[in-house]
UniProtKB/Swiss-Prot annotation:
GO terms for cellular component: extracellular region. GO terms for molecular function: toxin activity. Expressed by the venom gland. InterPro entries: Spider_toxin_CSTX_knottin, Spider_toxin_CSTX_Knottin_CS. The presence of a 'disulfide through disulfide knot' structurally defines this protein as a knottin. This is Toxin-like structure LSTX-D5. Keywords: Disulfide bond, Knottin, Secreted, Signal, Toxin. Belongs to the neurotoxin 19 (CSTX) family. 02 (D7) subfamily. It comes from Lycosa singoriensis (Wolf spider). Disulfide bonds join C45-C60, C52-C69, C59-C85, C71-C83.
C-alpha cells in the first residue's frame, strides 16, 4: 500500500511539473506586454509628509521600506483629522543602521 502511495505521489509531481513547463513556454512578447500593462496601471505614490487622506495606501517607498499613512488631530481645537505619509521611527533607525553597515563594508 505504501509503494502505491509513493508511486501516485511521484506521478502527481511529474504531471504538475510537466504542466508548469507549458506555462513557461509563453512567448516573451506576451510576457512583456503583460508587464507593460501592469506598470501603466500603477498609480502615483504620495511623497513623505504630504496628505494621504484620499488614499491611505498610496505612500511612497523609501530606500527599504514603504512609508505609512499616519492620521492625527492637530492641536488648536480643530476636529478635522489630518493624514500624512510618514516613516515610523523604528524603520528609520533600521535604514540608518543598514546604510552605516553598507558604508563600513562597502
Amino acid at each position: 500500500m505504501m509503494k502505491v502511495l509513493v508511486v501516485v505521489a511521484l506521478l502527481v509531481t511529474l504531471i504538475s511539473y510537466s504542466s508548469s513547463e507549458g506555462i513557461d513556454d509563453l512567448e516573451t512578447d506576451e510576457l512583456l506586454s503583460l508587464m507593460a500593462n501592469e506598470q501603466t496601471r500603477a498609480k502615483a505614490c504620495t511623497p513623505r509628509y504630504y496628505d494621504c487622506s484620499h488614499d491611505r495606501h498610496s505612500c511612497c517607498r523609501s530606500s527599504m521600506f514603504k512609508d505609512v499613512c499616519t492620521c492625527f488631530y492637530p492641536e488648536g481645537g480643530d476636529n478635522k483629522e489630518v493624514c500624512t505619509c510618514q516613516q515610523p521611527k523604528h524603520l528609520k533607525y533600521m535604514e540608518k543602521a543598514t546604510d552605516k553597515i553598507k558604508n563600513l563594508f562597502g
